[in-house]
């Protein structure tokens, strides 16, 4: 059992009771909801005659089904419109804060909570979305939950959970040029596997993470779940505090000083005991691209697709399946693979720093003929900031479409979908079969900068070979 980790401290502080099952009844400090996993939960509350216990601890927005082109109401998709109306009514009925389209605060749930200062160190955070681990970048314990658990949080502000073990994932050194936070997490998942983190919370540590911005830390924590870890976090530090200071929901005045003192106290102790420790060298990480149908099937841009002998007996069947589905062969270089669609956005890489970096590679270049490329800001605030900096003009002049905020093609529960066998270069987080809207569509995951490189070349390309414009 680990001692002195942030995970242990936050877990213990939020423990209401230990249940006969051995699970912990855990108090949830912040509950985030959206239009997809909440309607049924509210219906279950109504059927049982229950109210939302602490409506002030729940914040809602719309993101999954939101169109990124024509957002006029009612939506053309009648089911999407019904889901929108259901969430609007539920929030009104229960007094829940709701950030709707046009409010200036709408966006992907895992983008808006941090940018508003709602996400803070030491919190327990739950959301009916598997990428809730994003918020761990602040030193919060955050995890995705199912619809019945959404109901439980609404009704009791608690969850019954089994405590996770803690694995320290340490990365040391300065990242090489052209290597980003997305490459770091893809490299970790490639090495530890998509099931390697099952039963664990990942504590991301080491000098590489100490140098990262909050946006970069969020990218890494976002994809903890792709590595099997339900929760991933980084200990809060001055970078965390500077990000939060002055944000709308962050503490102010004397409360701020008290908050920072407490946030520092929950950091993992120097002598904390972990259930496991793995160490990586930042210099071993290169621009990384997934080639298959799981986030663990990734390789460096200079590598070729591995043969079956590279995989364990247990992993060989899915590797064989990936070769066939992706129409790629062992020994084939990933560089030069033709792309049809290039997507920049999602809760993994739709923040302002992602767009700034991508724009520096797009500037002065042109999207290749036959390639559809588009950029979807993660929130209305991100969109407004990007436009104030003129980033939208850079993208549009390069041939990218500039869209409204939403989850977009990450999961294609909206009009943004692949068609047929199209192959997508995507800054999102999942590359499962059919993930981006077509049952036969194919997805390659990579950093936003690498997506721009692919868009310009019309094929998977090394961003290190693309000139970078001045900011």
Curated annotation (Swiss-Prot):
Reactions accelerated catalytically: (2R,3S)-3-isopropylmalate = (2S)-2-isopropylmalate
Cofactor: how and how many bound: Binds 1 [4Fe-4S] cluster per subunit.
Keyword terms: 4Fe-4S, Amino-acid biosynthesis, Branched-chain amino acid biosynthesis, Iron, Iron-sulfur, Leucine biosynthesis, Lyase, Metal-binding
Annotated residues for binding of [4Fe-4S] cluster: 347, 407, 410
InterPro entries given in the database record: 3-IsopropMal_deHydase_lsu, Acnase/IPM_dHydase_lsu_aba_1/3, Acoase/IPM_deHydtase_lsu_aba, Aconitase_4Fe-4S_BS, Aconitase_4Fe-4S_dom, IPM_dehydratase_rel_enz, IPMI_cat
The keyword Lipid metabolism appears for this protein: no
Superkingdom classification of source: Bacteria
Cofactor list: [4Fe-4S] cluster
PROSITE patterns assigned to the protein according to its UniProt record, in alphabetical order: ACONITASE_1, ACONITASE_2
Single GO BP term: L-leucine biosynthetic process
Pathway where this protein functions: Amino-acid biosynthesis; L-leucine biosynthesis; L-leucine from 3-methyl-2-oxobutanoate: step 2/4
Enzyme Commission code: 4.2.1.33
Function per UniProt: Catalyzes the isomerization between 2-isopropylmalate and 3-isopropylmalate, via the formation of 2-isopropylmaleate.
Quaternary structure and partners: Heterodimer of LeuC and LeuD.
Family per record: Belongs to the aconitase/IPM isomerase family. LeuC type 1 subfamily.
Matches recorded under PANTHER family: 3-ISOPROPYLMALATE DEHYDRATASE (PTHR43822:SF9), HOMOACONITASE, MITOCHONDRIAL-RELATED (PTHR43822)
Name listed for the protein in its UniProt record: 3-isopropylmalate dehydratase large subunit
Lineage: Bacteria, Bacillati, Cyanobacteriota, Cyanophyceae, Acaryochloridales
């Amino acid at each position: 059992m680990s001692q002195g980790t942030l995970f242990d401290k936050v877990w213990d502080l939020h423990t209401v009771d230990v249940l006969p099952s051995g699970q912990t009844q855990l108090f949830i400090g912040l509950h985030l909801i959206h239009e997809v996993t909440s309607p049924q939960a509210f219906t279950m509350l109504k059927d049982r005659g229950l109210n939302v216990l602490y409506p002030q601890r729940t914040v809602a927005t719309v993101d999954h089904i939101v169109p990124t082109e024509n957002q006029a109401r009612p939506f053309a998709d009648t089911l999407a419109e019904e889901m929108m109306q259901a969430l609007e009514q539920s929030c009104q009925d229960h007094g829940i804060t709701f950030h709707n389209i046009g409010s200036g605060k709408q966006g992907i749930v895992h983008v808006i909570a941090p940018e508003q200062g709602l996400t803070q160190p030491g919190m327990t955070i739950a959301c009916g979305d598997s990428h809730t681990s994003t918020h761990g970048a602040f030193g919060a314990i955050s995890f995705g939950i199912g619809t019945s658990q959404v109901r439980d949080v609404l009704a009791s502000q608690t969850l019954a959970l089994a405590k996770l073990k803690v694995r320290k994932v340490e990365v040391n050194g300065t990242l090489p040029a052209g290597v980003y936070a997305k490459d770091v997490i893809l490299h970790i998942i490639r090495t530890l596997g998509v099931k390697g983190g099952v039963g664990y919370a990942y504590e991301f540590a080491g000098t590489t993470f100490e140098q990262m911005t909050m946006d970069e830390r969020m990218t890494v924590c976002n994809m903890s779940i792709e590595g099997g870890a339900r929760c991933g976090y980084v200990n809060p530090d001055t970078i965390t505090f500077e990000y939060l200071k002055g944000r709308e929901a962050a503490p102010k005045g004397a409360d701020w000083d008290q908050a920072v003192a407490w946030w520092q106290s929950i950091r993992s102790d120097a002598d904390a005991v972990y259930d496991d420790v793995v160490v990586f060298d930042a210099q071993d990480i290169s621009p990384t691209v997934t080639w298959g149908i799981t986030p663990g099937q990734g390789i460096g841009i200079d590598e070729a697709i591995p043969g079956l002998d590279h995989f364990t007996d247990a992993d060989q069947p899915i590797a064989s399946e990936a070769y066939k589905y992706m129409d790629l062969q062992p020994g084939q270089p990933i560089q030069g693979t033709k792309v049809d669609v290039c997507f920049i956005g999602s809760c993994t890489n739709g923040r302002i720093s992602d767009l700034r970096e991508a724009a520096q590679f797009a500037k002065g270049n042109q999207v290749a003929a036959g390639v559809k490329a588009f950029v979807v800001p993660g929130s209305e605030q991100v969109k407004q900031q990007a436009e104030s900096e003129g980033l939208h003009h850079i993208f549009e002049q390069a041939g990218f479409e500039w869209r409204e905020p939403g989850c977009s093609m990450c999961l294609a529960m909206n009009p943004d979908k692949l068609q047929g066998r199209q192959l997508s270069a995507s800054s999102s987080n999942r590359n499962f079969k059919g993930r981006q809207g077509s049952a036969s569509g194919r997805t390659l995951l990579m950093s936003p900068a690498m997506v721009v490189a692919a868009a310009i070349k019309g094929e998977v390309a090394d961003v290190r070979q693309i000139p970078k414009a001045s900011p």
